[in-house]
Amino acid sequence: MHLNENTKILGHRVILVPYEARHVPKYHEWMSNETLRELTASEELTLEEEHEMQRSWREDSDKLTFIVLDAETYSRDQDEIAAMVGDTNLFLHQDPDSQIPTAEAEIMIAEPYARGKGFGREAMLLMLKYAQSQPQLKLDKFEVKIDMDNAASLHLFKSFMFVETRRVEIFHEVTLERPITPDWINWLDQQVDLRMQCYQ
């Protein structure tokens, strides 16, 4: 999606930047890890296929992607590749039952050293806040689909007041949803400040 191609989002622990071609080799390295692929329901791709995927995500109007940087590492020498720790995505669609404009959210902290430090929580809060603040997206609801064994992600989204709505045993998957209401936006505003800069 072109919406965020010039947007950098600044948090305390993390910085979100658009997914660029220069990020692909490290992303590809992450996705060679079988456990990560299982947790994210991803297929193993060649480096060339990963580059094609990055280009397609940039062009597709229904996908919004940021790379998550460790803010402390980035502050040392502004090396984005060295600071990369994960990514966060939104997939936009109409809810098949209600036709409500919905965004399916994803967060991945790929670097083992970066887990358990609040990076995923802050990155996801920033992504949710950014998306709900963009009037052109016209979102009414967020949802997540999480592997039943991914206790950390289930706990994270329940702490964001997402509620389980569906459980599909055959896919070993749980769906949680969060309507975008004024009360929830107020809660979100208390969790993070949305600070943005122009990204070159």
UniProtKB/Swiss-Prot annotation:
It is found in: Nucleus; Cytoplasm, Cytoskeleton, Spindle; Cytoplasm, Cytoskeleton, Spindle pole. Keywords: Acyltransferase, Cytoplasm, Cytoskeleton, Nucleus, Transferase. Its EC number is 2.3.1.308. Interacts with microtubules as well as alpha/beta-tubulin heterodimers. This is Alpha/beta-tubulin-N-acetyltransferase 9. The gene is Mnat9. GO terms for cellular component: cytoplasm; nucleus; spindle pole. Disruption phenotype: RNAi-mediated knockdown in the posterior compartment of the wing disk, results in adult wings that are reduced in size, display abnormally thin veins and form blisters in the posterior part of the wing. Defects are mainly due to activation of the JNK signaling pathway leading to increased apoptosis in the developing wing. RNAi-mediated knockdown in the dorsoventral (DV) boundary and anterior-posterior (AP) boundary regions of the wing disk, induces notching along the adult wing margin and a reduction in the AP boundary region between the L3 and L4 veins. It comes from Drosophila melanogaster. One of its GO terms (biological process) is negative regulation of microtubule depolymerization. GO terms for molecular function: microtubule binding; tubulin N-terminal-methionine acetyltransferase activity. Belongs to the acetyltransferase family. GNAT subfamily. InterPro entries: Acyl_CoA_acyltransferase, GNAT_dom, NAT9-like. Residues 34-181 form the N-acetyltransferase domain. Gene3D superfamilies: 3.40.630.30. N-acetyltransferase that mediates the acetylation of the N-terminal residues of alpha- and beta-tubulin. Required for microtubule stability and inhibition of JNK signaling to promote cell survival during development, possibly acting independently of its N-acetyltransferase activity. Necessary for the stabilization of spindle microtubules and for mitosis progression. Regulates microtubule stability by inhibiting Spastin-mediated depolymerization and promoting Eb1-mediated polymerization. It comes from the Eukaryota. It is an enzyme of class 2 (transferase). It catalyses: N-terminal L-methionyl-[tubulin] + acetyl-CoA = N-terminal N(alpha)-acetyl-L-methionyl-[tubulin] + CoA + H(+).
